[in-house]
Amino acid sequence: MNNLIEKIIWILTINFMLNACSSVAKDPPKPKNSRINKLDSLLTISEPEAKAIGKRIWINECGGTIEGLTSWNKGEYFASLGIGHFIWYHRIKRGPYEESFPSLVRYLVSKGVNVPEFIFNKHCPWETREDFVKAKNSPQMIELRNLLFSTIPLQTEFILLRLENALPKMVSAISIKNRSKVQSNFYKLTRTAKGKYAL
């Protein structure tokens, strides 16, 4: 089983590295406070890297559209937001997945981003998918999309931080003899933009 997990990780990594995305989608704007960023980790990502990687993720995950940054899939009971499909639950119905949107909001605030007041609410303001769809063109939804579009590079940083924070758990699922090698290879991949994108 451990070998299977290791093989899957390597296949996915190689696949992502080999499949470069090409698109003519408009570049997301860089945040006002952009600069070369040292993440709160062992990872470093430059502003151009964060922007380019974020654009690729945005195209792959959201179709390169601003509307694609806010979604709520049929059969689910949570909003899926941003390039990382960050989950945001309503207070009434929680789920088995880790809620990641509030953590993203805290990260954005720590980077000096002004976020709309309603986002500071601990829970998603839309109770159901139907409520969410009805609010498609509401001022709140437009404000949310604008925030998500303007922070694509910061979302990229946040995705990498979450991945690095999950590394110990991922490594614990493989054989002890391969753990240091996999961890070393993880950080080798983070030294290049293509490696960061693959991760």
Residue ranges and their predicted role:
Residues 9-10, 64:
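Intrinsically disordered, low-complexity segments enriched in glycine/proline and serine/threonine
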